[in-house]
Structure formats: structure tokens, C-alpha cells
Amino acid sequence: MYDIVFISYKESNADRNWNLLKSRYPSAKRINGVKGIQQAHIKAAKKCFTKMFWVVDADAELLDNFNFNYEVDEYNLETVHVWRSQNPVNDLVYGYGGVKLLPTRLTKKMDTSKPDMTTSISSNFKVINQVSNITAFNTDSFNSWKSGFRECAKLASRIIDRQNNTETIERLDTWCNKGTNRPFGLECIAGAKAGKKFGEKNKNNPKELAKINDFDWLLESFYAECKRN
């Protein structure tokens, strides 16, 4: 029904996950190596010919029972749809890293000044209560740190529209404390704590918060923290 796009940027498990997706859905497309999350999604939208398109992140390990047969009615063609994902470090299950179904036209002209990509596309947002994948970001030190940093910067700064404050506090606490015994769990927690601090400090500074979408800046920040510690 809708185009499927796999978006990758230097993830160590990207090729493996891409090959698995391609084996199940041969018509899937790939956007690889585009700097900036928003720019990558804009390029993805420009490659699509359907009114909506699916986005699968490079670190997503799709569940066997998930398929791409969801159909959007005409009243929701401008709505961002997000499925749930399981976090392999702290076991949280919510929209972080989940498969997304995006409106093509609106994605092409999204507001790139906003730090949170999904809420910069449309004011209409729908959570689908189904787990689509495991977000296997904990494959190396940097990607684990980066994932914790980015998500906790967004949570702590309250930039995500319609955030539930109690839920946000619980998620922040889990990101910052749980998973020490999991692969690269310590790096994830270190990134989460640094991201929380960064988000709280810059909650009223959208320009500074937008840096969380710049992977080169994140890599520099990661190395700087490694040197400090």
C-alpha cells in the first residue's frame, strides 16, 4: 500500500537489518549516509510515490509478526503514525525507535528548526499500540551513548508535544539508571545522564537543542566526555 524506506547513517548493524528487510520486502528503498535526521527523512519522502510512507530505522530488528499492511483512512493522511518498540537495554516499550508511517507531502516540507523530528512534520500524531521491533542500538559504545543522549535530551527539555509529565519522569529515570548488565548498558546510561543535563540546560534554546540531530556534533561530544572521564 505504501512505500517502505530504510534510513541508515553509520550504524554497525545497518547492512544486516537492511538485507533482512529487503528479503521480506524487495521493493523497499534505502537512504544511507545523509547528514542530519530531518534531511534524511526529507530525502526519503522525495523518493516515494505514495501519499504515506513507512520509515524503518537502521537499528530496528522487525518482529516476525509485524507487517506493513496498515491502511490510513482519508481523514488521517496528514497524521504521523508511530508504532511501539522495545528497548534492549532498559526494557522500556514506547514509541522510541518504532516503525513510523509518515505523510509524504508534509515530510518533504517539515520544519527543520525543531529538535524533535516526528512532531516537526504534523500537529496530528497517532500512537499505534503494537510493538513493531526491537531498537537494537546497543551495538557499540558511541551508538549506545548517542541513543541515550538524544532521547533524554528530548525528554528532559519537554520539546515533544503532548508529553505526559509523569510518564516522562519515569522514562528519564529508567534511561538513566537501568541496564547496567546489558551490552553497552553503561555507555547508554552515561549518554542518558549527559543528555538529561543538556536538555534541562537548553530547554528554552531550540537552536542549541537542534544539535542532537547532528551526528558529527554528537560524536565530538561523545569523545569529549570520554576524555573527561
Language-model-detected regions and their locations in the chain:
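Short beta-strand-to-loop acidic/aromatic patch adjacent to the donor-nucleotide binding site
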Residues: 51-63
